Regions:
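C-terminal output helix
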Residues: 118, 135-146
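Conserved phosphotransfer microenvironments
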Residues: 65, 81-97
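Short amphipathic alpha-helix used as the core "switch/output" element in two-component signaling
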Residues: 70, 91-104
Length: 160
């Protein structure tokens, strides 16, 4: 969580600068991102890509829907990166995590290799914040989508 500010005075500012915590807002707790994909190769690739691209994330992995939903129920998750093409159905996970698309429990980014516009439209209609194709997405693209999704959900929660 970013430092919210306050009156530190000159000594506090000096210490903050010495520790690399000044100006306020520079120090943040990493967001917890859960990557869900039944393909072990894709799961490792995207999890490692996020870890290597940015220290902003604590990345968790799940290879199936049941374990993913248990993880989401047992600890705070800031964003989910979800493959829809899984034996248990990625849409099932999406609907569990976003029962009301106007106020999602957690932002969900769909990351799939299936290039079907109707699939993306259906995912967004059911609450996905963004839909990305694996074959044309970089770690930077995914990072940007995660940041935008978390900001959008935070704004929606604040407005309600």
């Amino acid at each position: 969580m970013p430092y919210a500010g306050g009156r530190l005075g000159p000594i506090g500012r000096h210490m903050g600068k010495a520790l690399g915590l000044w100006p306020p807002g520079q120090f943040t707790v990493p967001a917890t991102v859960l990557v869900i994909d039944d393909s072990e190769e894709d799961l490792k690739y995207w999890s490692n890509a996020l870890r290597q691209f940015s220290s902003r994330y604590t990345v968790l992995e799940s290879a199936n829907a049941a374990d993913a939903l248990n993880l989401c129920a047992s600890r705070p998750i800031d964003c989910v990166v979800l493959d829809l093409d899984m034996p248990e159905s990625g849409f099932h996970v999406l609907l569990e995590l976003v029962p009301d698309r106007r106020l999602p429990k957690v932002p969900v980014i769909v990351l799939t290799h299936l290039p079907h516009p109707n699939l993306f439209e259906m995912a967004k209609h059911n609450g996905a914040q963004a839909c990305l194709l694996k074959q044309s997405t970089s770690a930077q693209d995914l990072d940007q989508a995660i940041q935008q999704a978390m900001a959008a959900v935070k704004a929606a929660r604040s407005a309600s």
